[in-house]
Amino acid sequence: VVAAGANPVLITRDLVNVLEDAIR
């Protein structure tokens, strides 16, 4: 997970990737 304070968009994309991995 991207460190706090980083680009919110990058954090969102990282979370989406985690969710996609969980769905697969």
Curated annotation (Swiss-Prot):
UniProt keyword Chloroplast, yes or no: yes
GO molecular function, one term: ATP binding
Keyword annotations: ATP-binding, Chaperone, Chloroplast, Nucleotide-binding, Plastid
Main location: plastid
GO cellular component, one term: chloroplast
Disulfide bonds: none
Location relative to the cell: Plastid, Chloroplast
Family: Belongs to the chaperonin (HSP60) family.
Subunit-level organization: Oligomer of probably six alpha and six beta subunits.
Note: This protein shows ATPase activity.
Biological function: This protein binds RuBisCO small and large subunits and is implicated in the assembly of the enzyme oligomer.
Protein name as annotated: RuBisCO large subunit-binding protein subunit beta, chloroplastic
Species whose genome carries this gene: Populus euphratica
